[in-house]
């Protein structure tokens, strides 16, 4: 099935934009550097390529315009006549013809100048021929600028046309202006057509969709039609006439019996008789609208006779319709009869389409494939299926034993219906006691999710955990008391008790001052007036505990900061008794000076590769490996001159290949 989607037509540029597009593409897609020292064949090929490429681009763009715009003779007659009404078929064809002529002229110009370029004997002549060829092509295109502008306006208007499928199931609404056509369409479809209390609110075709018996129907709202000669009708009315003439649809002729539209029933009947030829072989329904303002019983006898004449004419044009299906009444204000009108029109249209298909030749090919076999009785004896009695009894027992489980819907109907019966969502909970089902359990308690702590065996698990903790604590106490206290003397026992007391006091003080100790800064000696942080005091306290303070004191001295100048210059001045010792000490001082100048560290600081106790390295090899890995991780950051790992600044990038060889006058615009 052909899909008419005019929104896919490519935008048509005007003459100046067209030239800019083509020449810019030629400049970008073809070589731009040529020298007079090249061979003449190379020069000819260079400029011939530009002319051919430009002609190819012109041909492709113009061909796309010609091919994408619909040809009125090849599309559905409805769209052909609609486009003729809207845009004038002669002007439309003339514009496309001028585009086609321009395409042929450009091809001819390219062919002529390529032939001339074959005989070019210098770079200057070849270039002049190229300029002349491209100039003539652009001149031809600029001459059709009005046609291109006209086609662009047509393209924009066609993109706004509704997507009407001429071959699908269609319901067409027609009648005088302001009789309620758009209001009915808004009721039966999801379309949002503007409705106003004045005539000719609808100025073009509008499409909506509705469903009937699981089938999709398109509903077309047409502009109002006036009763006047065909030659006097305007474009708005001709859109309605075109739709009535070419679409195989169910027609709803709206009749305003109240006269509020500004036209009497006699005028509306005259319009019906003037266009009744367009209703031939189509399901026709006469809809008497606005019955809320004027009921059918209150109209005059003359108007009633006119309506009866219209109904009799509709019976002649319609195919196999009854009187009830031809004349219907409704009110879009109160929604009375709206759905009955829609259903009657859809049913009439469906019956007509089925009947038309049954009369076609293709249906015979399908009907021959169907065969319904009906067995004929050979006698009057009734032969029932033979089922054993045991099977019947078993099925009866199963049916009796199988009780239907009552659902919440059944319980609701038994207990008073909706609003009276309240279903309990907790009655099927599986708990240890039934009285627990209706307990109110919070979701959050003391900042914790209650569901995380729900466990049926929580009490049993708690008892097991307490028993294990008791066994473990008892084992620890026994292990602590395993010391052979009997082997210790009285003096040793006294020292042991003092050590334990001091240890407990230290632990307690450490816990109290933990946060303070972590944030404490290094205290210089001159501010340590109470002599709290000295190695002598540390040695006395460790000796009082019974520990050897020598290793701790050596480590403290190695970590302490000394005087740099004394360590570097005067370290070798003590105990110099012999000249040889003086010479060796002098060399050591020189080495110490150079090392201090190179790495800027004091003599008390150990070398970088030397392992200091407490650093966590096994030997100097492992420490050097760790230092290398650390330095390697900093390379990427240092290479990009980052301030740190969080530095994500991207500086202004000015790549050289994009900024070199560019001057304002364009003298050196080549790289």
UniProtKB/Swiss-Prot annotation:
Keywords, sorted A to Z: GTP-binding, Nucleotide-binding, Nucleus, Ribosome biogenesis
Primary residence: nucleus
Compositionally biased tracts (Basic residues): 631-640, 654-671
CDD domains xref list: NOG
GO cellular component: nucleolus
InterPro entries in the cross-refs: G_OBG, GTP-bd, NOG1, NOG1_N, NOG1_Rossman_fold_dom, NOG_C, P-loop_NTPase
One Pfam family linked to the record: NOG1_N
GO BP, one annotated term: ribosome biogenesis
Keyword GTP-binding: yes
Bias type Polar residues, positions: 595-605
Region annotated Disordered, chain positions: 516-671
GTP-binding in keyword set: yes
Molecular-function GO terms, alphabetical: GTP binding; mRNA binding
Residues that coordinate or bind GTP: 175-182, 221-225, 289-292
Record's subcellular location: Nucleus, Nucleolus
Domain OBG-type G: 169-350
Protein family: Belongs to the TRAFAC class OBG-HflX-like GTPase superfamily. OBG GTPase family. NOG subfamily.
Stated role: Involved in the biogenesis of the 60S ribosomal subunit.
Protein name per its UniProtKB record: Nucleolar GTP-binding protein 1
């Amino acid at each position: 099935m052909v899909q008419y989607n005019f929104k896919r037509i490519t935008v048509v540029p005007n003459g100046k934009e067209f030239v800019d597009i083509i020449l810019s593409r030629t400049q970008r897609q073809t070589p731009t550097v040529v020298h007079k020292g090249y061979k003449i064949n190379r020069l000819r090929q260079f400029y011939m390529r530009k002319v051919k490429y430009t002609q190819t681009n012109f041909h492709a763009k113009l061909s796309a315009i010609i091919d994408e715009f619909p040809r009125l003779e090849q599309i559905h007659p409805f769209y052909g006549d609609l486009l003729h009404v809207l845009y004038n078929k002669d002007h439309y064809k003339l514009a496309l013809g001028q585009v086609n002529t321009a395409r042929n002229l450009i091809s001819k110009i390219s062919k002529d100048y390529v032939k001339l370029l074959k005989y070019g004997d210098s770079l200057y002549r070849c270039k002049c021929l190229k300029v002349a060829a491209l100039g003539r092509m652009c001149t031809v295109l600029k001459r059709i600028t009005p046609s291109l502008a006209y086609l662009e306006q047509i393209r924009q208007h066609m993109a706004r046309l509704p997507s009407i499928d001429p071959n699908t199931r269609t319901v067409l609404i027609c009648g005088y202006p302001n009789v309620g056509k758009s209001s009915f369409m808004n009721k039966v479809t999801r379309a949002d057509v503007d409705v106003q209390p004045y005539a000719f609110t609808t100025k073009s075709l509008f499409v909506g969709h509705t469903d009937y018996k699981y089938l999709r129907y398109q509903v077309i709202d047409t502009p109002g039609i006036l009763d006047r000669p065909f030659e006097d009708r305007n474009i708005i009315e001709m859109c309605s006439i075109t739709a009535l003439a070419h679409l195989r649809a169910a027609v709803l002729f709206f009749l305003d019996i109240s006269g509020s539209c500004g036209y009497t029933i006699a005028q509306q009947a005259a319009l019906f008789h003037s266009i009744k030829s367009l209703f031939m072989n189509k399901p026709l329904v006469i809809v008497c609208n606005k019955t809320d303002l004027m009921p059918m019983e209150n109209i005059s006898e003359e108007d009633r006779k006119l309506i009866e004449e219209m109904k009799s004419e509709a019976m002649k044009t319609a195919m196999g319709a009854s009187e009830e299906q031809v004349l219907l009444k409704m009110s879009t204000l109160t929604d009375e009869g709206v759905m009955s009108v829609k259903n009657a029109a859809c049913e009439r249209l469906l019956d007509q389409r089925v009947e038309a298909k049954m009369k076609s030749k293709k249906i015979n090919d399908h009907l021959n494939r169907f065969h319904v076999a009906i067995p004929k009785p050979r006698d009057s004896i009734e032969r029932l299926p033979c089922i054993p009695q045991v099977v019947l009894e078993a099925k009866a027992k199963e049916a009796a034993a199988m009780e239907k489980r009552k659902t919440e819907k059944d319980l609701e109907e038994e207990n008073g219906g909706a609003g009276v019966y309240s279903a309990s969502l907790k009655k099927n909970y599986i708990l240890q006691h039934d009285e627990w089902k209706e307990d109110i359990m919070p979701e959050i308690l003391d900042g914790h999710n209650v569901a995380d702590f729900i466990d049926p065996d929580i009490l049993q698990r708690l008892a097991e955990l307490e028993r294990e903790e008791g066994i473990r604590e008892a084992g620890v106490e026994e292990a602590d008391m395993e010391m052979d206290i009997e082997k210790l003397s009285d003096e040793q026992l006294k020292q042991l008790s003092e050590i334990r007391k001091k240890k407990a006091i230290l632990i307690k003080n450490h816990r109290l001052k933990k946060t303070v100790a972590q944030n404490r800064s290094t205290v210089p000696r001159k501010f340590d007036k109470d002599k709290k942080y000295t190695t002598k005091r540390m040695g006395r306290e460790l000796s009082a505990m019974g520990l050897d303070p020598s290793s701790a004191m050596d480590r403290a001295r190695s970590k302490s900061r000394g005087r740099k100048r004394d360590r570097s210059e005067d370290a070798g001045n003590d105990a110099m008794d012999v000249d040889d010792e003086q010479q060796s000490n002098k060399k050591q001082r020189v080495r110490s000076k150079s090392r201090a100048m190179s790495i800027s560290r004091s003599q008390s600081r150990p070398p970088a590769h030397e392992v200091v106790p407490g650093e966590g390295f096994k030997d100097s090899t492992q420490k050097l490996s760790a230092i290398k890995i650390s330095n390697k991780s900093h390379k990427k950051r240092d290479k990009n001159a980052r301030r740190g790992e969080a530095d994500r600044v991207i500086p202004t990038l000015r790549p050289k290949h994009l900024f070199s060889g560019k001057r304002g006058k364009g003298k050196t615009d080549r790289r």
